């Protein structure tokens, strides 16, 4: 008699990961719950999340392991985030956390300690294998309002081969309904709306102030004229309008954060747009790196609408993205540009710079 396959369910203590664990158990897997202990304090990634995850595992009658990676989280995510803001960019910690921790350290723990090579998570995304290309693909979730493929673009082929996304074909409402039907203790738990770091600190401002010394500096326009004073350049990001504290006859937006000179550059909305951008650390997902430029739909922020663009591959895992129809607003260095063909993620990379030429 063949035994049922084993799978690790990554459990944060939230409704999504809990339902994902219940679904793979229902599909016949022998499930082992694993929760990553990321930081001290209360919240979804701290003690509250671990307690809720433990209760769910008890309800599902599956074993539960807690893996203490607080030091690795500090080094891999916190330091990365702080250094990025010091440099005047807007880092994307969630994609890094997915690659390095959830499908990095967690998968390594599953293989080494549990002898399990597959991980199910509560991400809203889809994946599979294309026999024609010989590649594992990544695609948007059915629920476009909750789709998280943007944050998963950097997963390697090996990581995608080990990933299971049980919620990819479901809507958030269906997930909530199923959690209630199963009687899960987290069925009505409120959804976390912030980064786990922000949740623990109370706000992004609090988090940054705890890690970066505040230095006042100048707010200038694109010609260098001084318009006002800021309370720390790390509190500003490209495209920001609120909180500038500068009077002008037209709305002002952050055009650039000049960390080297401790300046925040502002201008009219059109001055915060770009016709192209360059990206680095490119990861090609559902297709191999092409030899020639390709057409694709590009998303330059998590909530931005995809726009038609030309992707020109560059050496050293780089690419240039030229927007075909119109300049794009608020292209922030440090964020990801992810390109799609329909629902499938073709690739993505970290935005390095943008231009209007």
Curated annotation (Swiss-Prot):
Q: SUPFAM superfamilies, from UniProt?
A: Adenine nucleotide alpha hydrolases-like
- Active site, per annotation: 97 (nucleophile), 196 (cysteine persulfide intermediate)
Q: What Gene Ontology terms describe what this protein does at the molecular function level?
A: ATP binding; tRNA binding; tRNA-uridine 2-sulfurtransferase activity
Would you say which domain of life the source belongs to? Bacteria
Q: Name one GO cellular component term.
A: cytoplasm
Q: Where in the cell is it found?
A: Cytoplasm
Annotated positions binding ATP: 10-17, 36, 122
Q: Which residues form the signal peptide?
A: none
A GO BP entry = tRNA wobble position uridine thiolation
- Show the disulfide pairing: 97-196
ATP-binding recorded as keyword: yes
What is this protein for, i.e. what is its function? Catalyzes the 2-thiolation of uridine at the wobble position (U34) of tRNA, leading to the formation of s(2)U34.
Q: Which PANTHER family match?
A: MITOCHONDRIAL TRNA-SPECIFIC 2-THIOURIDYLASE 1, TRNA 5-METHYLAMINOMETHYL-2-THIOURIDYLATE -METHYLTRANSFERASE
Which protein is depicted? tRNA-specific 2-thiouridylase MnmA
Q: Which organism is it from?
A: Gloeobacter violaceus (strain ATCC 29082 / PCC 7421)
